[in-house]
Amino acid sequence: MSFLKKSLFLVLFLGLVSFSICEEEKRETEEEENEDEIEEQSEEKKRFEPVPPGFTPFRQT
């Protein structure tokens, strides 16, 4: 009986450790994806900055 308890605890412990490692990796990939999205949004904002009043891309003579 003692052998079964030890084996069961060992299996549960190893499963818990592997689960926590997977969750940590998942969290890291989500953070990287969020950082990429933030960079893309900031690049879009830079492209579409408001034009100052009175500005025209055409030459005025």
Curated annotation (Swiss-Prot):
Subcellular localization, as worded in the UniProt entry: Secreted
InterPro entries associated with the record: Frog_antimicrobial_propeptide
GO biological process entries: defense response; vasodilation
Tissue distribution: Expressed by the skin glands.
Annotated Pfam families: FSAP_sig_propep (PF03032)
Signal peptide positions (record): 1-22
Signal among keywords: yes
Biased composition (Acidic residues): 30-42
Modified residues (4-hydroxyproline): 52
Keywords assigned by UniProt, alphabetized: Amphibian defense peptide, G-protein coupled receptor impairing toxin, Hydroxylation, Secreted, Signal, Toxin, Vasoactive, Vasodilator
Main location: secreted
A GO-annotated cellular component: extracellular region
Family indicated by similarity: Belongs to the frog skin active peptide (FSAP) family. Bradykinin-related peptide subfamily.
Function: May produce in vitro relaxation of rat arterial smooth muscle and constriction of intestinal smooth muscle. May target bradykinin receptors (BDKRB).
Name of the featured protein: Probradykinin-2
Taxonomic path: Eukaryota, Metazoa, Chordata, Craniata, Vertebrata
Gene: pb-H2
